[in-house]
Amino acid sequence: KENLTKLINNEINPMSREDISVLEFRDVIKTVNSAYEDVKLCSQTILELHGYLHRYSHIRGGRYRNEEINIVNSEHYQFFDYQSKVDLEANIEKNIKKDIENICQKYYELMNEDEIQDLIIIASFIIDFILILPFKEDNIKMAKILTLLLLNKSNYEVGRFTSLGEFFDNEKQLYFKNLFSKRGDFEKESYNMNKWLEYFLS
């Protein structure tokens, strides 16, 4: 932990790919904290943030995945079932972009209606984003970044007081994976959202 703090503060040089990943994540968090008022939530912004998250990496960032993935359907949001290999790669990427655009649009619609508490709207957006799994790598990191962005936009400037690395700590990540790992869990829409809101707001 001491070395992590020194790395973040540029007191030591990165020695591994993991160290570089920490610096990439730190830089994106700094950008979001300083420029959130001018950042629009949209597909293009999400791609740019993902690209920035991998700017020193051999992993190509800033592009939605174009490979199939096993995921179950949920009544909470209309997700695709990629268990078959019918979709072409281009269609997969196109469909993901459409999904992301849809949840971004829904976020703004709900915020403008001003009938639901901001934190619930943000939590709903984040769970939709995670379940879409738009990228090959670092979907959870992107969820942290988008959480910070949206909380800042709603004047919950948590990034000034804590690192959102703690938001998805190891124990909670395991809990989350277990919660949404079975088809039966997806079929219980209200159960899922209640559990997610409890997890998100705790």
List PLM regions with ranges.
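FIC/Doc superfamily catalytic core
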Residues: K1-S202
